[in-house]
Amino acid sequence: MLLRQPTTVTEAQECMAQGAVPVGGATLVWATWQRDGFPDLAMSLRGLPEATAVEPESLGAAVVLHRIDDRVPEVLRRAAGSVGTGAVRRTATVGGNLVGSSLRCLLPAALVLDARATVLGPDQPYETDLAEVVAKRHLLLGLRWRTPVASGYRKQPAEAGGPPPLVVATAVHVDGEGRHRLRVAVREGYDVLSETAGCDAGPDETLDALERTDLGALPAGARDVVREQVADILGPRAGR
């Protein structure tokens, strides 16, 4: 297998045109290749500046998870810190987790940040939503978002080898008219749900609104965790 490491977007597009298969931190991809055979040509984005940035409102797809620190919002930092072991976080990448892994541990955090994805198309990079990236498995260059007012993250304990643990991510944003909106994303099993509700009226009213969305159909235990997380993030705002 020949591995190329482009340092510009143009070089990366040339690699794509030649049929190069992206390789990064998704260990499941390596396992598949070991079983089925390695591709003739692969490419890594770790030499591409657009894919290696760690900034307050952007994160590159080739960033390994252990590099995600307090430069990014709390919800994303805590999501990255909860993935696997230290050894896993030193090799797993943002793009590998979101596109190459069935668990997609970072997806709830990215959804509540209302993150937009920059992907590498055949002609030029373009921006799209996370749903398209996950569904079509695009070559991800990075994520961008607006800094939230507050954010939170909770991952329930789980037994090794069992089903994926419940994840609840939250973030409060200010819309164009100055109103506060709460975004909540839940990973239940392999499914991820995301909903939004106004939150200026307080936790109780916000929870009532969320119960009328698809989140209201979650199992009772998952709804309890959602309620706790909503109370945690909105409680300090009560009375403001």
Where do the PLM segments sit?
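C-terminal structural segment of proteins
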Residues: 1-240
